[in-house]
Protein backbone atom coordinates (compact mmCIF):
# COMPACT_ATOMS: atom_id res chain seq x y z
CA UNK A 1 0.00 0.00 0.00
CA UNK A 2 1.05 3.62 -0.50
CA UNK A 3 0.20 6.15 2.17
CA UNK A 4 0.74 9.88 2.68
CA UNK A 5 2.34 10.50 6.06
CA UNK A 6 2.20 13.70 8.09
CA UNK A 7 4.31 15.08 10.94
CA UNK A 8 7.12 12.58 10.56
CA UNK A 9 10.61 14.02 10.75
CA UNK A 10 13.78 11.90 10.86
CA UNK A 11 17.00 13.21 12.41
CA UNK A 12 19.98 12.18 10.22
CA UNK A 13 22.30 12.07 13.26
CA UNK A 14 20.01 9.52 14.91
CA UNK A 15 18.42 7.96 11.83
CA UNK A 16 18.18 4.44 13.25
CA UNK A 17 16.48 5.48 16.47
CA UNK A 18 14.30 8.07 14.63
CA UNK A 19 12.99 5.49 12.16
CA UNK A 20 12.57 2.71 14.73
CA UNK A 21 10.77 5.08 17.11
CA UNK A 22 8.43 6.16 14.28
CA UNK A 23 7.75 2.51 13.39
CA UNK A 24 6.92 1.60 16.98
CA UNK A 25 4.44 4.46 17.53
CA UNK A 26 0.89 3.17 17.31
CA UNK A 27 -1.06 4.28 14.21
CA UNK A 28 1.99 5.49 12.21
CA UNK A 29 2.20 2.39 9.99
CA UNK A 30 0.46 -0.97 9.99
CA UNK A 31 2.42 -3.63 11.89
CA UNK A 32 5.16 -1.03 12.54
CA UNK A 33 6.78 -3.01 15.36
CA UNK A 34 7.38 -5.89 12.88
CA UNK A 35 9.95 -3.73 11.03
CA UNK A 36 13.48 -2.52 11.70
CA UNK A 37 15.55 0.28 10.08
CA UNK A 38 18.03 -0.96 7.45
CA UNK A 39 20.88 1.54 7.16
CA UNK A 40 22.72 -0.45 4.49
CA UNK A 41 19.69 -0.60 2.20
CA UNK A 42 18.77 3.09 2.62
CA UNK A 43 19.99 6.01 0.48
CA UNK A 44 20.14 9.51 1.92
CA UNK A 45 22.61 10.87 -0.64
CA UNK A 46 20.47 10.73 -3.78
CA UNK A 47 18.26 13.49 -5.19
CA UNK A 48 15.29 11.47 -3.91
CA UNK A 49 16.41 10.23 -0.47
CA UNK A 50 14.83 7.02 0.82
CA UNK A 51 14.99 5.05 4.03
CA UNK A 52 14.18 1.36 4.15
CA UNK A 53 12.85 -0.68 7.04
CA UNK A 54 12.51 -4.44 6.70
CA UNK A 55 10.11 -6.79 8.35
CA UNK A 56 11.86 -9.09 10.80
CA UNK A 57 11.21 -12.62 11.94
CA UNK A 58 12.84 -14.05 15.03
CA UNK A 59 15.16 -11.02 15.16
CA UNK A 60 16.42 -11.35 11.57
CA UNK A 61 15.27 -8.92 8.84
CA UNK A 62 13.99 -9.90 5.41
CA UNK A 63 15.69 -8.42 2.37
CA UNK A 64 12.86 -8.81 -0.05
CA UNK A 65 10.26 -6.71 -1.86
CA UNK A 66 7.46 -8.55 -0.04
CA UNK A 67 8.48 -7.45 3.47
CA UNK A 68 9.62 -3.84 3.59
CA UNK A 69 8.68 -0.22 4.07
CA UNK A 70 10.36 2.42 1.92
CA UNK A 71 10.02 5.98 3.19
CA UNK A 72 10.38 8.70 0.53
CA UNK A 73 12.00 11.72 2.15
CA UNK A 74 12.33 15.45 1.58
CA UNK A 75 15.48 17.08 3.02
CA UNK A 76 14.63 20.04 5.26
CA UNK A 77 17.54 21.96 6.77
CA UNK A 78 19.05 19.43 9.18
CA UNK A 79 16.35 16.77 9.02
CA UNK A 80 14.28 14.67 6.62
CA UNK A 81 10.50 14.77 6.34
CA UNK A 82 8.59 11.71 5.21
CA UNK A 83 6.56 12.61 2.12
CA UNK A 84 5.09 9.13 1.60
CA UNK A 85 5.86 5.48 2.14
CA UNK A 86 5.17 2.18 0.45
CA UNK A 87 4.74 -0.95 2.52
CA UNK A 88 4.60 -4.68 1.97
CA UNK A 89 4.07 -7.20 4.77
CA UNK A 90 4.31 -10.97 5.14
CA UNK A 91 1.70 -12.72 7.25
CA UNK A 92 1.38 -16.30 8.48
CA UNK A 93 5.14 -16.90 8.57
CA UNK A 94 5.97 -20.56 9.27
CA UNK A 95 9.32 -21.95 10.33
CA UNK A 96 10.14 -24.91 8.07
CA UNK A 97 13.10 -26.40 9.89
CA UNK A 98 14.72 -26.48 13.29
CA UNK A 99 17.22 -23.77 14.07
CA UNK A 100 20.67 -24.76 12.89
CA UNK A 101 24.09 -23.23 13.20
CA UNK A 102 24.68 -20.61 10.50
CA UNK A 103 27.95 -19.94 8.74
CA UNK A 104 29.60 -16.78 10.07
CA UNK A 105 30.20 -13.57 8.17
CA UNK A 106 33.89 -14.53 8.17
CA UNK A 107 32.99 -17.81 6.42
CA UNK A 108 30.94 -15.88 3.85
CA UNK A 109 33.77 -13.43 3.16
CA UNK A 110 36.26 -16.30 2.75
CA UNK A 111 33.87 -17.97 0.29
CA UNK A 112 33.62 -14.76 -1.73
CA UNK A 113 37.40 -14.37 -1.71
CA UNK A 114 38.12 -17.97 -2.75
CA UNK A 115 35.61 -17.59 -5.61
CA UNK A 116 37.24 -14.36 -6.87
CA UNK A 117 34.34 -12.11 -5.87
CA UNK A 118 36.67 -9.92 -3.79
CA UNK A 119 39.53 -8.61 -5.89
CA UNK A 120 42.89 -7.42 -4.60
CA UNK A 121 42.67 -3.90 -3.20
CA UNK A 122 38.93 -4.13 -2.57
CA UNK A 123 37.37 -2.93 0.66
CA UNK A 124 34.42 -4.45 2.50
CA UNK A 125 31.98 -1.65 3.33
CA UNK A 126 29.36 -3.58 5.30
CA UNK A 127 27.86 -7.01 6.00
CA UNK A 128 24.23 -7.81 6.75
CA UNK A 129 22.51 -11.08 7.57
CA UNK A 130 18.93 -11.17 6.26
CA UNK A 131 16.33 -13.60 4.99
CA UNK A 132 16.16 -13.92 1.20
CA UNK A 133 13.57 -15.73 -0.91
CA UNK A 134 15.13 -18.69 -2.71
CA UNK A 135 12.10 -20.69 -3.81
CA UNK A 136 8.37 -20.36 -4.32
CA UNK A 137 6.31 -23.49 -3.62
CA UNK A 138 2.55 -23.43 -4.30
CA UNK A 139 2.31 -19.65 -3.87
CA UNK A 140 4.40 -19.71 -0.68
CA UNK A 141 7.86 -18.16 -0.50
CA UNK A 142 10.75 -20.09 1.06
CA UNK A 143 13.37 -17.90 2.74
CA UNK A 144 16.88 -18.69 3.97
CA UNK A 145 19.37 -16.55 5.89
CA UNK A 146 21.84 -14.90 3.50
CA UNK A 147 24.95 -12.84 4.17
CA UNK A 148 24.94 -9.66 2.05
CA UNK A 149 28.44 -8.20 1.65
CA UNK A 150 29.05 -4.79 0.05
CA UNK A 151 32.45 -4.58 -1.62
CA UNK A 152 34.12 -1.45 -2.94
CA UNK A 153 36.44 -2.42 -5.80
CA UNK A 154 39.71 -0.60 -6.55
CA UNK A 155 37.91 1.41 -9.28
CA UNK A 156 35.48 2.64 -6.55
CA UNK A 157 32.46 0.75 -7.88
CA UNK A 158 30.33 -1.01 -5.28
CA UNK A 159 29.00 -4.54 -5.65
CA UNK A 160 26.79 -6.42 -3.22
CA UNK A 161 27.41 -10.15 -3.11
CA UNK A 162 25.28 -12.70 -1.28
CA UNK A 163 26.16 -15.99 0.39
CA UNK A 164 23.66 -18.56 1.67
CA UNK A 165 24.28 -18.74 5.45
CA UNK A 166 23.13 -22.39 5.65
CA UNK A 167 25.29 -23.82 2.86
CA UNK A 168 28.01 -21.13 2.59
CA UNK A 169 27.50 -21.01 -1.20
CA UNK A 170 27.29 -17.90 -3.34
CA UNK A 171 23.77 -16.92 -4.34
CA UNK A 172 24.01 -16.15 -8.04
CA UNK A 173 20.52 -16.50 -9.42
CA UNK A 174 18.10 -13.57 -9.29
CA UNK A 175 15.17 -15.59 -10.60
CA UNK A 176 13.28 -17.55 -7.99
CA UNK A 177 12.32 -21.08 -9.04
CA UNK A 178 8.63 -21.95 -8.73
CA UNK A 179 7.32 -25.39 -7.85
CA UNK A 180 3.71 -26.05 -8.81
CA UNK A 181 1.48 -29.08 -8.30
CA UNK A 182 0.54 -30.85 -11.54
Segments (PLM) and residue ranges:
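Generic detector of bulky aromatic hydrophobic side chains
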Residues: 35-36, 74-77, 179
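Structured segments of extracytoplasmic/periplasmic soluble domains
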Residues: 21-29, 72-74, 111, 115, ...
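Extracytoplasmic/luminal low-complexity segments enriched in Pro/Gly and acidic/polar residues
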Residues: 78-182
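Aromatic/basic-lined ligand-recognition segments
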Residues: 43-75, 122-140, 144-147
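Preferential activation on post-signal-peptide N-terminal prodomains/segments
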Residues: 1-43, 48-59
